[in-house]
Amino acid sequence: PHFYPQNETPARFLERRKGAGARLEGAIASLPDHGAGLPRRILGAEVYYFDELWRMDPVALSALCIGDTGILMVEMPSDSWGHRVFDCLEKLIYQQNVRPMIAHIDRCYKAVQDPEALDALIGQGLLIQMNAGALSGLMSRRNAYQWIRAGRIHRIGSDCHNMKDRKPELSGAMAWTRKHLDEAVAEELFAKAGS
């Protein structure tokens, strides 16, 4: 789920997430096959960026990470990223010992005004995730391909929110990636969280 620090405290969010996780596990347990064959579920959060994110309580910040991976999904602003953004991401890495993963970069390519600063942070441990939908349109596919070839994309995800209008559609993106990139690259881009 999304964590918007301007709307709720980390403690309130974690309680809400715990309840949602329990409801999901209960629904899966009630299936005839008890969810055999379903992917492993790992709790995490997509944390909305704010300049003081790096100042959050370390325990709360760790609890927002994907399971025990130390990876924090961060939803970035769509306006231009100045040095304050890069400073915050760097402080998450070095002062909080958290690996930020920028969520759905395909929504904010243009916000990256300093690709060299982004590449430097990638070299320090920053991860970047792209939505599978970025590989469906001609223009978005061109940008996605350039970012993947430049080594800036570490994971491709579905951005699934529900089973109606935000389904986990990965097969088309996976097929395209396997066709146009090395098989090993495709496997890495679609790897499970924490691997």
What is each PLM-predicted segment?
Residues F3-N7, Y49-F50, R107-V112, L135-M139, ...:
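Active-site environment of divalent metal-dependent phosphoester hydrolases
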Residues N7-Q129:
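Extended substrate/RNA-proximal surfaces in nucleic-acid metabolism proteins
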Residues G67, A150-G151:
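Structured loop/turn residues at beta-strand edges in well-structured enzyme cores
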Residues E116, L127-M130, L135-N143:
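A C-terminal functional module that forms or caps the active site or interfaces directly
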Residues A120, Q146-W147:
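Well-formed, non-transmembrane alpha-helical positions, independent of function
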Residues R142-Y145, G151-I153:
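Flexible, acidic glycine-rich loops studded with aromatic residues
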Residues R152-P168:
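Short acidic/histidine-rich active-site segments
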Residues L170-S195:
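Mid-to-C-terminal alpha-helical segments outside catalytic/metal-binding sites
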